Design a protein with these regions (language model features):
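Short active-site neighborhood of thiol/selenol oxidoreductases, capturing the structured segment around
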Residues: 197-227, 242-244
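Structural microenvironment flanking redox-active thiols in thiol-disulfide oxidoreductases
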Residues: 223-260, 274-279
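Non-catalytic, surface beta->alpha helical segment in thiol-disulfide oxidoreductase systems
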Residues: 286-289, 295-320
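C-terminal motif of bacterial Sec signal peptides marking the signal peptidase cleavage site
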Residues: 14-17
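Positively charged n-region of N-terminal signal peptides that target proteins for export
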Residues: 1-5
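Short, internal strand/loop/helix patches
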Residues: 259-291, 295-296
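Oxidative protein folding and maturation machinery
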Residues: 19-192
Length: 320
């Protein structure tokens, strides 16, 4: 009996310790856990979207999982990045105050998760994704207003490496320029004939402020896409829309040479005082850059992807 017990124990121990001695187990990864649908008592579409935004990360943060070069909290890189992009798309569907509260709450959860294990790579990996999607000028979902609460947190967090603090502080200052709902900074510009105009002097229900350069491929793409809007010329002639293409660099010969390429019913000019860059009136990180302003020159969309600007105008002016 004792002999059988010893043999059984040895078999059990062998099963538990099977494999090469001391060999670490492979990391266990998971799919991104989508939030539960809104409860049945949440009936309005806007309320259901807000619910999804507010609970988007609940299941994700509820788990303890590995963060390494291949995954963030157990979710592989491609999956977590796609999920973050989905989250940002949802933020665009809720009021700005709801969106910025959500990103502020998300940053607090990021810090809390890192505090559970100070040696984890989680904070570093997740904040890299945040910056890539919300602040990179080439990101199709970039949004400085969404990013501001997070980058302010990153600038002050004990989990941020000291060498990154000045960069985050600078980004926070830049993102605070001309926020959603504020009146943008006014400036003067000259047209091709040397006449001086001002941004505030433009009269239209909506103004597209388009920082562009001559011979810029991406600028030409935006010009073509705007021109392809069926009702664009009618919107401009009726005063519903003005398009102001402003050149902010110093190669004026190129700008003058390129003038025939701009639509005749657009407002074109150059910053003859060079104050937009030198005084940093706007955070123009890359050309092209698009702002959409209301009649009072308040910000509706800031450094926005062209698709967002076009969709907004089509929605607001389609029946005009």
């Amino acid at each position: 009996m004792v002999k059988k017990l010893i043999i059984s124990t040895c078999v059990l121990l062998a099963a538990v310790s099977c494999g090469s001695p001391g060999k670490p187990s492979s990391p266990v990864y998971r799919s991104f856990p989508l939030p539960d649908p809104a409860p049945v008592m949440v009936t309005g579409e806007a309320e259901r979207i807000a619910y999804s935004v507010n609970h988007f990360w609940d299941k994700y943060f509820a788990e303890q999982a590995v963060t390494d070069s291949a995954a963030v909290l157990g979710v592989k890189n491609d999956d977590i990045e796609k999920s973050f992009a989905t989250y940002v798309s949802l933020l665009n569907l809720v009021p700005m105050d709801v969106a910025v509260k959500s990103t502020a709450d998300l940053f607090r959860r990021i810090e809390a998760k890192q505090a559970e294990n100070d040696s984890s790579l989680f904070y570093l990996r997740f904040t890299e994704i945040v910056s890539k999607y919300l602040y990179d000028p080439n990101s199709p979902v970039r949004n400085e207003d969404f990013y501001l609460p997070m980058v302010k947190g990153m600038a002050a967090s004990r989990f941020t490496s000291e060498d990154m603090v000045p960069a985050y502080e600078y980004e926070a200052r830049m993102c605070a320029l001309n926020p959603y709902g504020s009146k943008v900074a006014d400036f003067k510009f000259k047209d091709i004939n040397g006449r001086v105009h001002s941004l505030y002097g433009i009269r239209a229900t909506y103004t597209i402020l388009f920082f562009s350069n001559p011979y810029c491929t991406n600028c030409k793409e935006i010009m073509d896409n705007l021109q392809s809007l069926e009702n664009l010329n009618w919107w401009i002639s009726s005063g519903d829309l003005a398009v102001a293409s402003i050149y902010i660099d110093r190669e004026l010969d190129e700008w003058r040479e390129y003038q025939p390429n701009y639509p005749k019913n657009w407002i074109t000019g150059y910053d003859h005082n060079y104050i937009i860059r030198e005084d940093v009136l706007y955070n123009v990180r890359a050309i092209p850059s698009l702002y959409l302003l209301d009649a009072e020159k308040r910000v509706i969309l800031k450094d926005a992807p062209q698709e967002q600007v076009i969709q907004y105008l089509a929605r607001k002016l389609q029946n005009k």
